[in-house]
Swiss-Prot record:
EC id: 3.5.1.5
Subunit structure of this chain's protein: Heterotrimer of UreA (gamma), UreB (beta) and UreC (alpha) subunits. Three heterotrimers associate to form the active enzyme.
Pathway it works in: Nitrogen metabolism; urea degradation; CO(2) and NH(3) from urea (urease route): step 1/1
Originating species: Thermosynechococcus vestitus (strain NIES-2133 / IAM M-273 / BP-1)
Highest taxon, organism lineage: Bacteria
Name listed for the protein in its UniProt record: Urease subunit beta
MF terms in GO: urease activity
Amino acid sequence: MIPGELIPAEGTIELNAGRPTVTLTVANTGDRPIQVGSHYHFYEVNPALQFEREQARGMRLDIPAGTAIRFEPGDERVVQLVALGGTRQIYGFRGEVNGAL
C-alpha cells in the first residue's frame, strides 16, 4: 500500500443510494454567471436562480462531492437534487433556515 492510496471495494459504487431526489428546471435570470457547489443547500442559492424553491428545501445537487454546476446568464437547465444527509440541520448559507429542516 502507498500512503494516501485508495483501494475501492469490488463492483459499482452508487452515489446517494436510496436518498429521495427531485428534478427541477432552473433558470439564471441574472446578468452574471452563478456557480453552485455540490453540497450547497439548493433552497438558499442566489435569488437570481428561478425554480420551484420549496421543492429544494433540504436538498443539494446530486453530483460528485467537490464539483459544481455553473449557470450562465439566461441559461435554463434541468438539475437533479438529492436530500441532505446527517442530522438535517442547516446553518449558514444565506441564513434562511438556521436550524432543523
